[in-house]
Amino acid sequence: MSGTGALMTVHVGQCGNQLAQAFWKSMVDEHGINERGQTTHEDDMNDKKDLLFYQADDDHYVPRAVLVDLEPRVINGMMQSPNFSNLFNTDNIFMSDHGGGAGNNWASGYCQGQEVQEKIMDIIIREAENTNNLDGILFTHSVSGGTGSGTGSLLLERLREAFPKKVIQTYSVFANSDTSTDVVVHPYNWVLSMQRLIENPDHVVVLDNAALHRLAAGKFKTDTPTFDHINSLVARIMSTSTAPYRFNSAMCPSIRYLDLAPFPPMHFIQSAISPVVDPNENFTRKTSVADVTRFLLKPTSMMVSTASRVRPNDCMLSAYMFLQGQIEAHTIMTAEQNVDFAIRRPPFYMLKPLRMMHAPLSPYVRPQYKVSGLLLNNSTSVAPLFESLLSKYDKLRSKRAFIDKFEKIDNFSLDMMDDAMHIVQDLLDEYKAVVQKDYLTRGL
């Protein structure tokens, strides 16, 4: 695995493209690029702009991004904004001709996607072929609505087929079943999306909307967090998780080195960030490696609501903690030793599941704090979220509630829904089994 290749991003649906706005705003700031794709600073030798950007013939930088939606509002808004109107390659944008969206219906999004999939895949493959060495694809979407879940599911199938050896990492926004949502059929959309998330990506970063709102409300001191608040948190997760590749880390120079899924298909990743700061307020805390590490490892810090319900058998399967800022190497080693005893791993697993490392900061952006961190955590503690959503699905399905919304879609069969439910249940069984001593020998 020598050398470092490039990454491209695919953003699908309203939520996926709203995340694109926040993520790419962070990327241009962190790489010293203005809204016209021009550099604003002298290049730093550790700044690998070409990981996520390419240079056009006039040398301005262009995001290696593909934007997809079945209705035009969000993408049109981006392209009319001063931050993005001259940044993206308009040939990499797909919007449906009819512009009617998918009506928050997975079946509609999936079946409409079948009609336009070749056009979208032509864009993605062309962009990939313009890259000398593609390492992976970052994919943003929601699993609750119609386009992000349905069209997103279809594109994940096609991406895996087209790029069998590339890393596919999704940032998937979930609507927690314990909270209200304006999408009454979201448990159906979720279970159908989950099958494709189980079968296709290498990693799925689970972003629970309820947990994101709770964190934003507490840290930004508002009862009604905005999309900007929520999306800034997700952009921070995406930014920090890619920082080692973007700024020349020797410890983790490529997404191909990220070993987060030793037991596939258990590749669903929780995340936590610290500190969370309102950019409009003065930051008065003193940060340290020990303080940030302690916060990141608290179950209540995870971006998954049910993570606060600690279960005695839950195990960490694999995790990475990226620490940024003014840090001496020995403090990371000390912190790693101090937390190792508190981490529960599967009884058959001898390796340390947590790897802690220093991740470089952008040379062009000065943070408000001296030390910050991100935890990417593959733990069995994510299973209660899936159990909760599957229970909600079972209740709706047993009553055939809102099933007519799916039955009226051409080329959709309810067998697809039932098959997906069984695949999700198999995943939950796997989470229960992996904490047992005989996990590796069962069935032999």
Swiss-Prot record:
Role: Tubulin is the major constituent of microtubules. The gamma chain is found at microtubule organizing centers (MTOC) such as the spindle poles or the centrosome, suggesting that it is involved in the minus-end nucleation of microtubule assembly.
One biological process term in Gene Ontology: cytoplasmic microtubule organization
Alphabetic keyword roster: Cell junction, Cytoplasm, Cytoskeleton, GTP-binding, Microtubule, Nucleotide-binding
Recorded family membership: Belongs to the tubulin family.
SMART domains the UniProt entry points to: Tubulin
Principal subcellular localization: cytoplasm
Pfam families, per the entry: Tubulin (PF00091), Tubulin_C (PF03953)
Single GO MF descriptor: structural constituent of cytoskeleton
Alphabetized PROSITE patterns for the sequence: TUBULIN
Sequence positions that bind GTP: 144-150
InterPro entries: Gamma_tubulin (IPR002454), Tub_FtsZ_C (IPR008280), Tubulin (IPR000217), Tubulin/FtsZ-like_C (IPR037103), Tubulin/FtsZ_2-layer-sand-dom (IPR018316), Tubulin/FtsZ_GTPase_sf (IPR036525), Tubulin_C (IPR023123), Tubulin_CS (IPR017975)
Cross-referenced PANTHER family: TUBULIN
GO CC annotations, alphabetized: adherens junction; centrosome; cytoplasm; gamma-tubulin ring complex; hemidesmosome; microtubule; nucleus; spindle
Annotated compartments: Cytoplasm, Cytoskeleton, Microtubule organizing center, Centrosome; Cell junction, Hemidesmosome; Cell junction, Adherens junction
Name of the featured protein: Tubulin gamma chain
Gene3D superfamilies xrefs: Helix hairpin bin (1.10.287.600), Tubulin/FtsZ, C-terminal domain (3.30.1330.20), Tubulin/FtsZ, GTPase domain (3.40.50.1440)
